[in-house]
């Protein structure tokens, strides 16, 4: 079973802040986490079930560093539709 420690952070970008007004939370997680595991984490630790969950894997960008190619880390993020009136105090949202 997934643990709350598998949720790395809440993403705060222009897009995610706009989505928060509509009740959607953008969460960065461990790469092997699934939608069902994330749903269980929200039920267990926050006391509500998300209305909808969308996921995507974002590949790390290839960047040059001192003339050599490197790659940023890849990560997985979820768009979580939160029910009205639910709050996520433990993660700072």
UniProtKB/Swiss-Prot annotation:
Top-level division of the source organism's lineage: Bacteria
InterPro entries per record: Nucleotide-bd_a/b_plait_sf, Ribosomal_uL23-like, Ribosomal_uL23/eL15/eS24_sf
Keyword check for Disulfide bond: no
Keywords: Ribonucleoprotein, Ribosomal protein, RNA-binding, rRNA-binding
GO molecular function: rRNA binding; structural constituent of ribosome
One biological process term in Gene Ontology: translation
GO cellular component: ribonucleoprotein complex; ribosome
Signal sequence region: none
Subunit field text: Part of the 50S ribosomal subunit. Contacts protein L29, and trigger factor when it is bound to the ribosome.
Family the entry assigns: Belongs to the universal ribosomal protein uL23 family.
Record function comment: One of the early assembly proteins it binds 23S rRNA. One of the proteins that surrounds the polypeptide exit tunnel on the outside of the ribosome. Forms the main docking site for trigger factor binding to the ribosome.
Name used for this protein in its record: Large ribosomal subunit protein uL23
Native organism: Helicobacter acinonychis (strain Sheeba)
């Amino acid at each position: 079973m997934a643990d709350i420690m598998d949720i790395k952070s809440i993403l705060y970008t222009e897009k995610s802040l706009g989505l928060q007004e509509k009740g959607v939370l953008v969460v960065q997680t461990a790469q092997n986490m699934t939608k069902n595991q994330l749903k269980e984490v929200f039920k267990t630790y926050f006391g509500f079930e998300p209305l909808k969950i969308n996921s995507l894997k974002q590949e790390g960008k290839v960047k040059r560093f001192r003339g050599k190619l490197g790659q940023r880390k890849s990560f997985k993020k979820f768009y979580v539709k939160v029910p009205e009136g639910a709050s996520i105090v433990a993660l700072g949202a």
